[in-house]
Amino acid sequence: MKAVCVISGGMDSSTAAFIAKEQGYEILALHFDYNQRTMKKERECFNLICDDLGVKSREILDVSFIAQIGANSLTDKNLTIQKTGVKSGEIPNTYVPFRNGIFLSVAAAFAEKEGADALFIGVVEEDSSGYPDCSENFIKKIESAINAGTSPNFKLEIKIPLVHLSKTQIVKKALEIGVPLEHTWSCYEREDKACGFCDSCRLRLKGFKGADTKDTIPYI
């Protein structure tokens, strides 16, 4: 069995990839560069996680056209990354329009070429920033569209093992299956030391606190 794993270098996608390995899949690792602020750090963490997994097949794809579309603070440095938390029902300016839809479409093409059985992505719906392309409903619908638009001899299952877990549950699961969380990066803003205040840092720290364990990556 082969699975394409979309790995950003973050905690969630890395844990999803380790789950794929635990389930016996041969991992085809896929990473996307889209000129985000922390692109170099994320790429570094992707390679570290691939080394930890013993992955031989790894691809880094340039989808920098996402930055040309803009409309988000991850790629547009003229926008300030929100650090005040996210209110219920609010979509923060760190939301990259249809990013996961783009990633999954490209990953599906790669999976079809490679004859993969599954595609793992670490989306989280329950304890997240509220991005619409991280919901189970969206994933199921794009899975249906992918299978309608690819070869009849190809059927892809998109696996989202973390979608209904809290950040605390994700940290606990990661520790249970041996994910080296010190090799992952979550900060939206910085590559040297995590800011500790962007929504992604807040959620990460919340998970570690709930799991009663220390996050060993550097913070300012």
From Swiss-Prot:
InterPro entries the UniProt entry points to: QueC, Rossmann-like_a/b/a_fold
Record note on cofactor: Binds 1 zinc ion per subunit.
Enzyme class, first EC level, given as a word: ligase
Gene that encodes the chain: queC
Molecular function GO terms recorded: ATP binding; ligase activity, forming carbon-nitrogen bonds; zinc ion binding
Highest taxon of the lineage: Bacteria
Protein name listed in UniProt: 7-cyano-7-deazaguanine synthase
The family this protein is said to belong to: Belongs to the QueC family.
The EC number(s) this enzyme carries: 6.3.4.20
This protein's pathway: Purine metabolism; 7-cyano-7-deazaguanine biosynthesis
Protein purpose: Catalyzes the ATP-dependent conversion of 7-carboxy-7-deazaguanine (CDG) to 7-cyano-7-deazaguanine (preQ(0)).
Binding site for Zn(2+): 187, 195, 198, 201
Record has Metal-binding as a keyword: yes
